[in-house]
Amino acid sequence: MLLEFTKMHGLGNDFMVVDLISQRAYLDTATIQRLADRHFGVGFDQLLIVEPPDVPEADFKYRIFNADGSEVEQCGNGVRCFARFVHERHLTNKTNITVQTKAGIVKPELGQNGWVRVNMGYPKFLPNEIPFVAEEPKALYTLELANDQNISIDVVNMGNPHAVTIVPDVLTADVAGIGPQVESHKRFPERVNAGFMQVIDDKHVRLRVFERGVGETLACGTGACAAAVSGMRRGLLANSVEVELAGGKLQIEWQEGDVVWMTGPTTHVYDGRLDLRYFQG
């Protein structure tokens, strides 16, 4: 069967977006892994699925699958692309959209020239909300790594789990070595996204993220939210911060006790069709 899809990206964090309202398809783990292959498939960090909502207050249901086929709760760059996709495909004429995710409701607002502002919901910090194994809540935790190496982390749930550590320079940070250890650390029973943040000043940070089930990506929207909130909680950052990632910049806003707002661009790369039989086992 032919499957229609759209390739999009948010700051280089790239997606295959599939409308399963207007067409039907079954995409299992092995099929998603084959589609994600950058040599023999479409190639993407995440697969984004558009479905009818299960709850009356939502316009759409938004499902996210990593390149390894695992389903995850949230993707910030993805939700911006999702919002643009459903609007440009005329699945809705709304510019303020209510979207159901595994993590709850998010509310993207479409702006001009592909820019989208998203209400990302409330950050969570308690260990059982991440989830993270700890005897009691703390501002910072020490994580034991291989070769007697320790790092200091903050933990934040932005619809998906994040560990944030501050580094002197993101360019020289050992993301490839430390990232996988943090991602699969036994204290994170559902694994975690590992963020490495360099504070430039109180309104500007640089960030690299080793994403759960994907590896390091050019950008991570929820990671940018988690890092900014972590820095704000530590008193290092103002309430509106520019987060600079390899793929570009996001603006993150947060006031204590309020929701997090993320603003950033989206890019429509191309539309395509493929014969799904070649990707199924």
UniProtKB/Swiss-Prot annotation:
Residue numbers marked as site, Could be important to modulate the pK values of the two catalytic cysteine residues: 162, 211
Family matches, as InterPro entries: DAP_epimerase_AS, DAP_epimerase_DapF
Domain of life assignment: Bacteria
Single Gene Ontology BP annotation: lysine biosynthetic process via diaminopimelate
Reactions it catalyzes: (2S,6S)-2,6-diaminopimelate = meso-2,6-diaminopimelate
Keywords tagged on the record: Amino-acid biosynthesis, Cytoplasm, Isomerase, Lysine biosynthesis
Pathway: Amino-acid biosynthesis; L-lysine biosynthesis via DAP pathway; DL-2,6-diaminopimelate from LL-2,6-diaminopimelate: step 1/1
Root EC class: isomerase
Site (Important for dimerization): 270
GO MF term (any one): diaminopimelate epimerase activity
SUPFAM superfamilies: Diaminopimelate epimerase-like
Cellular component aspect of the GO annotation: cytosol
Residues involved in substrate binding: 13, 46, 66, 76-77, 160, 193, 211-212, 221-222
Predominant location category: cytoplasm
Active site: 75, 220
Localization: Cytoplasm
Subunit details: Homodimer.
Similarity section: Belongs to the diaminopimelate epimerase family.
Known function: Catalyzes the stereoinversion of LL-2,6-diaminopimelate (L,L-DAP) to meso-diaminopimelate (meso-DAP), a precursor of L-lysine and an essential component of the bacterial peptidoglycan.
Family matches, as HAMAP family: DAP_epimerase
PANTHER family: DIAMINOPIMELATE EPIMERASE (PTHR31689:SF0), DIAMINOPIMELATE EPIMERASE, CHLOROPLASTIC (PTHR31689)
Name of the molecule in the record: Diaminopimelate epimerase
